[in-house]
Amino acid sequence: MASRQPEVPPALAPSGPLSKMSLPIGMCRRAFSYDDALEDPAPMTPPPSDMGSIPWKPVIPERKYQHLDKTEEGAASVSSLAVTPSTATDSSDKAPVVKAKATHIIMNSLITKQTQESIQRFEQQAGLRDAGYTPHKGLTTEETKYLRVAEALHKLKLQSGETTREEKHPASAQSSPSSTPHSSPKQKSRGWFPSGSSTALPAPNPHSMDPGGGNDRNSADKWSLFGPRPLQKSDSGFAIQAYKGAPKPSPMEVMRAQATRAGEDPAVFKPPKMDVPVVEGKKQPPRTHNLKPRDLNVLTPTGF
């Protein structure tokens, strides 16, 4: 602590080309020795004595957004001017809170306005705007500019499929159903295969198929375009049944068939033998190493 130099107030600090970088107001320049601070049990950097006088928060002028206050919230300012002086003096203590709130609202509206204007600028550059758009009679052009963005968002939502039930099924103008499918209130869903009983193929007459008797009436009624067809008796005496294709063997049957086939003819499943010609000749003797002590320097790794 003894090696520290006395603190120099910023007002008396040397100001000139030889002086160091000027410190902000309230910061004191001191020559600090870290070796002394390590031996000293006291805190390394004690807080300055004039802690309360240091301006920590930035100073914001009160009426910075005065012109914005007039343009954005004209009605609110007019109503506040119309207040009697007695109430104004009573509410003087609440003035800072009201100012902060108004500033917050103004900043929000400013940000919104800038965002909308940048969106419109981009739309104009990209050619996304309708050229023949005219604003509504009761609205000013400024308001319709911002309404246009919400309108475009709504169109985007409709395109992405977020339609309501009323939009999906529009109510029919006609109260009674007509023959045309477009104007009828209930639209039939069209598929590949007809599902109604009226559109299904008519069942064959059992008497035309079987003139002998009416025992097969139930089986003939069950006959349809899809599903298993029962046996139909014909005059020629042959039984007519739907061909469903050859029965597919189960994998166990396939494995059994392969095993029996391999047992019957084992030569089929043997891999072909490769005939490698052996070159007959004298085998070369293994080479002996003729190493001399000086050659060991080359073979030794560098770490040794």
Curated annotation (Swiss-Prot):
Compositionally biased intervals (Polar residues): 77-90
Localization of this protein: Cytoplasm
UniProt modified residues of type Phosphoserine: 183-184
Ranges annotated as biased composition (Low complexity): 171-186
A GO cellular component annotation in the UniProt record: cytoplasm
Region (Disordered): 1-22, 38-57, 69-96, 159-231, 262-304
Domain of life: Eukaryota
Name of one Pfam family that matches: P33MONOX
EC number, as in UniProt: 1.-.-.-
Molecular function in Gene Ontology: oxidoreductase activity
PANTHER family in the cross-refs: MONOOXYGENASE P33MONOX-RELATED
Family: Belongs to the P33MONOX family.
Role description: Potential NADPH-dependent oxidoreductase. May be involved in the regulation of neuronal survival, differentiation and axonal outgrowth.
Entry protein name: Putative monooxygenase p33MONOX
Organism: Rattus norvegicus
